[in-house]
Amino acid sequence: MADVSERTLQLSVLVAFASGVLLGWQANRLRRRYLDWRKRRLQDKLAATQKKLDLA
């Protein structure tokens, strides 16, 4: 097994942690944007359907 120094190990753990945080943050932002878009779209569809029902 290769001898890995303590410093390299700490650095790799830090990089892995930072990339995980960054990835999770971006994924959560995307998820929120998708949910907001879906909510807005469904509300628009509901309004259109209610308008049709009112006209009928």
From Swiss-Prot:
It holds the Pfam family MTLN. The chain crosses the membrane at residues 10-27. It is a single-pass membrane protein. The keyword 4Fe-4S does not apply. Disulfide bonds: none annotated. Residues 28-56 are mitochondrial intermembrane. Residues 2-9 are mitochondrial matrix. One of its GO terms (biological process) is positive regulation of mitochondrial membrane potential. Its main location: mitochondrion. It is found in: Mitochondrion inner membrane. Coiled coil: none annotated. GO terms for cellular component: mitochondrial inner membrane; mitochondrion. Keywords: Membrane, Mitochondrion, Mitochondrion inner membrane, Transmembrane, Transmembrane helix. Interacts with mitochondrial trifunctional enzyme, a heterotetrameric complex composed of 2 HADHA subunits and 2 HADHB subunits. Interacts with cytochrome b5 reductase CYB5R3; the interaction is required to maintain cellular lipid composition and leads to stimulation of mitochondrial respiratory complex I activity. Interacts with ATP synthase subunit ATP5F1B/ATP5B. Positively regulates mitochondrial complex assembly and/or stability. Increases mitochondrial membrane potential while decreasing mitochondrial reactive oxygen species. Increases mitochondrial respiration rate. Increased mitochondrial respiratory activity promotes myogenic differentiation which facilitates muscle growth and regeneration. Increases mitochondrial calcium retention capacity. Plays a role in maintenance of cellular lipid composition through its interaction with cytochrome b5 reductase CYB5R3 which is required for mitochondrial respiratory complex I activity. Belongs to the mitoregulin family. This is Mitoregulin. It comes from Homo sapiens. The gene is MTLN.
